[in-house]
């Protein structure tokens, strides 16, 4: 969803558990 995980995903993946890539940032559900 909307909350930002404090991580970007220019590489296409997120390392933070429970976060997914919503280019170019990672979001938590």
From Swiss-Prot:
There is a cross-link at residues 1-29 (Cyclopeptide (Gly-Asn)). It comes from the Eukaryota. Pfam families: Cyclotide (PF03784). PROSITE patterns: CYCLOTIDE, CYCLOTIDE_MOEBIUS. This is a cyclic peptide. One of its GO terms (biological process) is defense response. Disulfide bonds join 5-19, 9-21, 14-26. The keyword Oxidoreductase does not apply. Keywords: Disulfide bond, Knottin, Plant defense. Probably participates in a plant defense mechanism. The presence of a 'disulfide through disulfide knot' structurally defines this protein as a knottin. Belongs to the cyclotide family. Moebius subfamily. This is Cyclotide vibi-A. It comes from Viola biflora (Yellow wood violet).
